[in-house]
């Protein structure tokens, strides 16, 4: 049984790594895979299972931090200075990168404020299967609208051309995505695209902006609940973290490589299919009624 439970922990880490930064809602997938199927709360206990999810989320966040490590060093003015993307060598030599620490801070402010004010309320009242399905569906529609609009934009901007106003508006959409199932990356990438960034630029800024705020949020949650960690459960935490980190690295790099080509609509369609599947399990078979 111990081996089976370890495998379940690895599976949850893999799911977290695949979905945390993809625009598909990691919350929706964790409800489907864990709460409706694997039920980590049964072999870890409800409190320890909650802490386990914080740990594997940190694995995904560290993966994103590693992928963007050079960007973070540049934003903090550590290491070599690079130049803005441009049409020719002269442009690249003459224009320093515009993305800086203030862009990131401006983008973090709305979600940071709402998180401090409403985090407990959201955790207590909005984490249910129906609310997650609503978030998945509405988020999918928003992504489709963004993609349809982006097709009309002739010269979308790169991440180094982002303005402080654009950063703030994208930050507001990150705050809206606190609704479970909406998806932080789905919301912010869509908003970035609507603000005339290209899909890769919107994704880059989304991940760069998300890393510090998620590190802070997960770190604070871990400090609150670290006493729930049992020595016997440590192997689950380690394997889950490593699975989330490793799979997260691959998923993030693959996503960033493909997003300008495939856009958001395939993810939106997937989300709608996921809503239908969860609805069948929930309303048709009563699975997850206690969540």
Curated annotation (Swiss-Prot):
<keyword id="KW-1003">Cell membrane</keyword>
<comment type="function">
    <text>Catalyzes the dephosphorylation of undecaprenyl diphosphate (UPP). Confers resistance to bacitracin.</text>
</comment>
<protein>
    <recommendedName>
        <fullName>Undecaprenyl-diphosphatase</fullName>
        <ecNumber>3.6.1.27</ecNumber>
    </recommendedName>
</protein>
<dbReference type="GO" id="GO:0050380">
    <property type="term" value="F:undecaprenyl-diphosphatase activity"/>
</dbReference>
<keyword id="KW-0472">Membrane</keyword>
<feature type="transmembrane region" description="Helical">
    <location>
        <begin position="102"/>
        <end position="122"/>
    </location>
</feature>
<feature type="transmembrane region" description="Helical">
    <location>
        <begin position="1"/>
        <end position="21"/>
    </location>
</feature>
<feature type="transmembrane region" description="Helical">
    <location>
        <begin position="267"/>
        <end position="287"/>
    </location>
</feature>
<dbReference type="GO" id="GO:0046677">
    <property type="term" value="P:response to antibiotic"/>
</dbReference>
<dbReference type="GO" id="GO:0009252">
    <property type="term" value="P:peptidoglycan biosynthetic process"/>
</dbReference>
<keyword id="KW-0812">Transmembrane</keyword>
<feature type="transmembrane region" description="Helical">
    <location>
        <begin position="231"/>
        <end position="251"/>
    </location>
</feature>
<keyword id="KW-1133">Transmembrane helix</keyword>
<dbReference type="Pfam" id="PF02673">
    <property type="entry name" value="BacA"/>
</dbReference>
<keyword id="KW-0378">Hydrolase</keyword>
<feature type="transmembrane region" description="Helical">
    <location>
        <begin position="48"/>
        <end position="68"/>
    </location>
</feature>
<feature type="transmembrane region" description="Helical">
    <location>
        <begin position="162"/>
        <end position="182"/>
    </location>
</feature>
<keyword id="KW-0046">Antibiotic resistance</keyword>
<dbReference type="GO" id="GO:0071555">
    <property type="term" value="P:cell wall organization"/>
</dbReference>
<keyword id="KW-0961">Cell wall biogenesis/degradation</keyword>
<comment type="similarity">
    <text>Belongs to the UppP family.</text>
</comment>
<keyword id="KW-0573">Peptidoglycan synthesis</keyword>
<dbReference type="GO" id="GO:0005886">
    <property type="term" value="C:plasma membrane"/>
</dbReference>
<feature type="transmembrane region" description="Helical">
    <location>
        <begin position="203"/>
        <end position="223"/>
    </location>
</feature>
<dbReference type="InterPro" id="IPR003824">
    <property type="entry name" value="UppP"/>
</dbReference>
<dbReference type="GO" id="GO:0008360">
    <property type="term" value="P:regulation of cell shape"/>
</dbReference>
<keyword id="KW-0133">Cell shape</keyword>
<dbReference type="GO" id="GO:0000270">
    <property type="term" value="P:peptidoglycan metabolic process"/>
</dbReference>
<feature type="transmembrane region" description="Helical">
    <location>
        <begin position="126"/>
        <end position="146"/>
    </location>
</feature>
